[in-house]
Every structure is written in C-alpha cells, then in structure tokens.
Amino acid sequence: MPNKSKPNRLIAEKSPYLLQHAHNPVDWFPWGEEAFAKAKRENKPVLVSIGYSTTCHWWPGIIKSCGTPLKDNRSHFKR
C-alpha cells in the first residue's frame, strides 16, 4: 500500500513482504531485539505479523484506517 509518506524502518529490509509495508503509516519493526527492547522499555505488548501475505487481504484496509484507532486504544495495553 504505497503512499507519499516518509518510509519507515522496513525500507532497509530485504524481505519483499517487509518492503511492501515500508510506506505504511504504522511504525513497524522487523523481528529483532530493537522491537522487543522498545516494548519492554515502554511496557507494551508486541503485535506480530507472520508475513503470510496471502492470508492478509484485509490488512491494507486496517493499515489505512489504523492511525486514530491505534492511538485511541493504546491505553488498553498499559499496565
């Protein structure tokens, strides 16, 4: 789902699946210590997308509309 926004950190990845999400408005992380360290530091859960794009035909709609819902629902994940 390309757009004209600045690419996120996935732009540096080699995986075609990750690269197709490099211009999403979501601040995605590739699998790795950086994501888990941030989650631990902020006391937040980690949402894992397994990268099986053929099962995610609904993902673009969620990504497109997620800005406000994600911001509004962050409080549900705080302890």
From Swiss-Prot:
PANTHER family the record matches: SPERMATOGENESIS-ASSOCIATED PROTEIN 20
Record's protein name: Uncharacterized protein YyaO
Coiled-coil region list: none
Gene (name only): yyaO
Pfam families: Thioredox_DsbH
Organism: Bacillus subtilis (strain 168)
